[in-house]
């Protein structure tokens, strides 16, 4: 049984003070034990996040990391720095990292291997853009991303650690909408791909999230799908009350 993972990706939002206020507000609200909740903040708030949530049932995550442990890499954050803070998860290959910062699959592959080496669970993001979707290449694109990003990584290394987040880039800020059936179709495709790449046991153990304008109004429909095991949420995770509704979607 895969425990759903509802992760709030704050992106470049919230100061450290605002993070403290969010946590205080969230502690006053109901936090379900039926799902794993995770907050993924900017680097500047990670220390506050891990300290203030230490005795809670909420996991923590970082939005990015470099694959080297130390050195002359100005502006980067290493996996051992994240591990020292007690971070549980790290996002690898978010669509904004791929498009804005031109991160390619070779780099992402190194990041995933490094995260696993340091016992940080990677949330690997994948997804196709509008042109790729309309030319019916969405499965081809996502398969290529996953195969390249996991190249050389063994099944035993990712069992119970890897999370995959499917992001339909074509449905984010384009006026197009992805239905829950669209999401289920791609998440099922990803699970079948993992079964071919590794084994059915591995595929059945991996949690596959959906990340495309998830909000309290649509999460119940999304989470009703067989192969969707959670959500990677953006804007709807920035307010404590909204995030609490997402976590408690089944109530």
Swiss-Prot record:
Pfam families assigned: TIM (PF00121)
Keyword Isomerase: yes
Uppermost EC category: isomerase
UniProt keyword list: Cytoplasm, Gluconeogenesis, Glycolysis, Isomerase
Pathway membership: Carbohydrate biosynthesis; gluconeogenesis; Carbohydrate degradation; glycolysis; D-glyceraldehyde 3-phosphate from glycerone phosphate: step 1/1
Gene Ontology CC: cytosol
Swiss-Prot/TrEMBL catalytic activity: D-glyceraldehyde 3-phosphate = dihydroxyacetone phosphate
Similarity comment text for this entry: Belongs to the triosephosphate isomerase family.
Record note on quaternary structure: Homodimer.
UniProt-listed NCBIfam families: tim
Protein name in the entry: Triosephosphate isomerase
Protein source organism: Finegoldia magna (strain ATCC 29328 / DSM 20472 / WAL 2508) (Peptostreptococcus magnus)
Higher taxonomy: Bacteria, Bacillati, Bacillota, Tissierellia, Tissierellales
Name of the coding gene: tpiA
